[in-house]
């Protein structure tokens, strides 16, 4: 997964966490809020953002000026993205489209837990193709060294928060998907079709998806 994609998921998940009291994804929440504030600052036309304006931007993005803003400002300063002063902060050559990469780096450099990486990893997979929790649990467990129980608990918690969606397809299995991209009926149909693909066909589909992700479109051969 490239850093811009990871940054986008961090912003998305941080917004979902605002509606909960869950404390299991602190690094995601912090990186996402840092990126959100960074995005707001980058949209300002001034090279210096006053403290009053900075606090207003924080409140507008559900960031507490007293309990959360100081730590976020300190992190952005550590990343050399802003320079704090007595009356506000100076923006150091920040551009809007670099925000996602900066957000990703803040998360990567944090002391985050493996289950936080897992929900980002699963979110990306589920947005590409609906997949079962059984299939994804094996991949996540192997890649991130989590036990099957830890993966299962993480997937349940993530779906309850709304990082991605799930739909039971049997007594022992759930379908994971992105509800913004796939309706529930469509997700089940896609999964049913994909489960019938032979290995060479599945490999070709993976190759096409990778090319689409890299280029955004593919030429139509006539």
What are these regions (language model features)?
Residues 1-222:
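Non-catalytic recognition/regulatory regions in large multidomain proteins
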């Amino acid at each position: 997964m490239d850093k811009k994609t990871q940054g986008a998921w961090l912003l998305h998940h941080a917004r979902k966490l605002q509606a909960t009291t869950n404390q299991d994804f602190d690094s995601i929440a912090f990186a996402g809020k840092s990126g959100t504030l960074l995005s707001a600052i980058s949209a300002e036309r001034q090279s210096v953002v006053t403290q009053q304006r900075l606090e207003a931007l924080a409140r507008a993005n559900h960031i507490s000026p007293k309990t959360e803003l100081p730590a976020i400002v300190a992190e952005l300063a550590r990343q050399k993205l802003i320079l704090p002063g007595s009356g506000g902060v100076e923006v150091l050559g920040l551009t809007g489209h670099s925000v996602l990469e900066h957000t990703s780096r803040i998360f990567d450099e944090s002391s985050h837990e493996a289950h936080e990486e897992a929900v980002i990893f699963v979110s990306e997979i589920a947005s590409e193709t609906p997949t079962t929790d059984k299939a994804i649990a094996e991949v996540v467990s192997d890649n991130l060294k989590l036990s099957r129980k830890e993966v299962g608990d993480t997937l349940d918690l993530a779906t309850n928060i709304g990082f991605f969606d799930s739909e039971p397809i049997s007594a022992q299995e759930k379908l994971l998907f992105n509800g913004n991209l796939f309706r529930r009926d469509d997700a089940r149909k896609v999964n049913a079709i994909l489960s019938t693909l032979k290995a060479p066909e599945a490999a070709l589909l993976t190759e096409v998806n990778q090319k689409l992700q890299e280029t955004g479109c593919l030429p139509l051969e006539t």
